[in-house]
């Protein structure tokens, strides 16, 4: 066993009853792995939008201010009444953060499965990754090839498996093409590459000409700019050409989900040979999987007939539904294509302490396309 420190620096997020959110670092006792567990030195962990939902939640980050405790940084921000209602279930509980990461196994329980991972570079899933070390069951780690850069291994789960889950869902629900929003993101670029390899027509929605060029540059065929005056016309044309009847929306709020359903219906009506006042009988599905826009989701159901659905999508329930065989195949593909299809790009690397700099926190909480932060707990 590697000589280990006695404590493990860990990031915590706490909502206080008086209407404040506090994010801090705390030195906790170093965990000891049980027989079927491994202790991993966390070398890299991405900041994903799903992490930010827990990290800052409904806090007003424009009110964030800095302090210290035991020589470690603390961020405090005010939480408006609506945010307190949304986070009522976590008031008073200091929660750990970080869905995924990558590191080296430095200690292991005495089971053969755990011992076999000693010294290996592994990808991690299971929360509490914004820490120097993480102890977790062997089934929650995925061995990576020798020499894997921790920055590549850090994002093995959330974005790669979510993008693959989109194409699997498309097949399972008998669709043949996809519409995707916020498509210039790391996840969006992965989906472009997956669909190109698998021959799946993909309509990409972005919000600037610069993002159009990014996706065109990696081979995307259908890219439409939601800020353009002719957005709806171009979206309908792309859906007519592809036949897309399923969409995945990362924005969540606003009118985009409704616009996608409207465009799908317009494309379906073009194929109808007989008029119906109830609209087409083509089933149209949009799943919301993100919350980049925190405003209410708005749409007019009269715009897309009566054969449609709008729902939520989360990776974990999908994997439970898909089963071990499908998930195993997805994981193998991620490892096989880790430095190609599923390579993530980071604009900033920060330490645990740097992540609690107020200006830095406000920057990564803005969730700007093209900006992705990687936490390196050991520098």
Predicted regions and their residues:
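C-terminal substrate-binding/catalytic core of Rossmann-like NAD(P)-dependent dehydrogenases/reductases
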Residues: 232-236, 240-241, 290-348
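Phosphate-coordination loops involved in phosphoryl transfer and adenosine-cofactor binding
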Residues: 174-176, 244, 283
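Adenosine-nucleotide cofactor-binding segment
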Residues: 197-275
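Glycine-rich beta-strand-centered segment in the early N-terminal region that forms part
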Residues: 31-46, 60-126
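C-terminal boundary of histidine-terminating zinc-finger modules
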Residues: 152
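C-terminal hydrophobic helical "lid"/dimerization subdomain
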Residues: 2-6, 261, 266-272, 316-379
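A structural motif shared across PLP-dependent enzymes of the aminotransferase-like
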Residues: 126-139
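Mid-domain Rossmann-like dinucleotide-binding core that forms the NAD(H)/NADP(H) cofactor-binding site
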Residues: 117, 156-229
